[in-house]
């Protein structure tokens, strides 16, 4: 799902939606959009910056997946992902929400593939850190990795094992996880790359300024 919202009037000017059966929607009517999603028996709703932008304007009935927050976690290494620049989707067509839906779907498929390429330990670490964060929970539910019986102590042991030669063995990981699980996840994603020129995107540092400090503490 994608919306075009006026910068001055903050009103919805256009809505685009793409279902997994290939059907598309392109109108400015929320009522018609909801009917379109209901007809497709949609359980999960995906978008780029969906949770803190589109979802504020749309009355969405489903589990939300936001490709924006997943991208720096799963593509932390330069040149990052070709569909993303800063916090925006790269699109051939300006102000076309259906085209943006197609790009978000392509990005989601790549994010799922990248997730599946992570080691089992990394998937478990990110799940334990992020499963209660609204920006990540929908994706983790979709890929079926929600944990129910793990603790912060367990995730600390997993982190020390997975990043054994990359982080300080005496770092207070439980404290970092308690302070900002998202910040810790982004810091670990960057530490796990072998490209020291890779940097955390500016929008991540704006929303999670603790990431740089966490990297300093861990390394």
Label the model's feature ranges.
Residues 12-15, 45, 51, 63-65, ...:
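Weak global preference for isoleucine
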Residues 134-219:
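N-terminal helicase ATP-binding lobe
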Residues 1-2, 71-74, 219:
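Short intrinsically disordered, low-complexity coil segments enriched in acidic
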Residues 9, 17-115:
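Conserved DEDDh/DEDDy metal-dependent 3′-5′ exonuclease domain
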Residues 32, 82, 124-125, 186, ...:
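Exposed alpha-helical structural elements
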Residues 1-16:
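Entry/capping segment at the start of metal-dependent catalytic domains
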Residues 13, 22, 180-184:
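Generic structural motif recognizing short loop/turn segments at the entrances and edges of beta-strands
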Residues 83-156:
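Acidic, Mg2+-coordinating catalytic module of metal-dependent nucleases/exonucleases
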